[in-house]
Amino acid sequence: MVRENKAAWKAQYFLKVVELFDEYPKCFIVGADNVGSKQMQNIRTSLRGLGVVLMGKNTMMRKAIRGHLENNAQLEKLLPHIKGNVGFVFTKGDLAEVRDKLLESKVRAPARAGAIAPLPVIIPAQNTGLGPEKTSFFQALSIPTKISKGTIEIINDVPILKPGDKVGASEATLLNMLNISPFSYGLAITQVYDSGSIFSPEILDIKPEDLRAKFQAGVANLAAVSLQIGYPTIASAPHSIANGFKNLLAIAASTEVEFKQAATIKEFIKDPSKFVAAAAASAPAAGAGAAAEKKEEAKKEESESEEDDDMGFGLFD
């Protein structure tokens, strides 16, 4: 009876995995180290309406995915990343929004002996409030201290753990005595799957403006190289045409070659006084515009002054 129930449960789990991959085009592969059942329940609640969390044994998840490769061969890309204590978070929504929800669900946690430090831990210089009888803890970790007003004072900031270090019993005890909870635990995103593509979660931090700037810089570099080596490309074509047109104008200006676009510059070369006349004609127009603006401002100030005088309040009213 137990075997039948277990077989039925496995079949149900495989069906659930297949249904989720068919329904949701996107998912996160998440690490669940140090995440307790209560925290996991809170995460599921926070994702309600945004995503679905699926946990399970790696062998079962791999087997379910392999059994579904005939219908969706792209899922094979997930298999190398199913290792360690991992699960899936499925979503149809915005990946960055779901990622932010997962980050918000992280909780502070004390250091436990045997845990692996995910980040550097530094004990700041401070008066600990602990009595001299606790000095041995600090000495065991080579932390410089002094006794100040009957309590232990840490003289300098002290790095106590580096990323990847195993937390020892002394470090855990000392951090707990100082009420320092250095770690935060939650579902850590390791890979992102989106409609057959799998990529690092850092890609989600790239904004459209970043892509646009990179693209424009790439086009500019391509155009510069193309112009330098004389190899025409779509990026360099506008610059090549502009440079060619300038060369044509230069040739027309120094020869008898005639074409419509060169007519104006040839006239100016023949009679520079026309250019002076044109410049002189544009100057009064600009001056008249500025004078009109000043006149309008003066009228406005005068109108405001009259309104202030007519407010109807005398000094002794």
From Swiss-Prot:
One of its GO terms (biological process) is cytoplasmic translation. Keywords: Phosphoprotein, Ribonucleoprotein, Ribosomal protein. The keyword Kinase does not apply. Residues 286-317 are annotated as: Disordered. Phosphorylated. Residues 292-302 have a biased composition (Basic and acidic residues). GO terms for molecular function: large ribosomal subunit rRNA binding; structural constituent of ribosome. It comes from the Eukaryota. SUPFAM superfamilies: Ribosomal protein L10-like. Gene3D superfamilies: 3.30.70.1730, 3.90.105.20. InterPro entries: Ribosomal_protein_uL10 (IPR050323), Ribosomal_uL10 (IPR001790), Ribosomal_uL10-like_insert (IPR040637), Ribosomal_uL10-like_insert_sf (IPR043164), Ribosomal_uL10-like_sf (IPR043141), uL10_eukaryotes (IPR030670). GO terms for cellular component: cytosolic large ribosomal subunit. P0 forms a pentameric complex by interaction with dimers of P1 and P2. Belongs to the universal ribosomal protein uL10 family. Ribosomal protein P0 is the functional equivalent of E.coli protein L10. This is Large ribosomal subunit protein uL10. It comes from Ceratitis capitata. The gene is RpLP0.
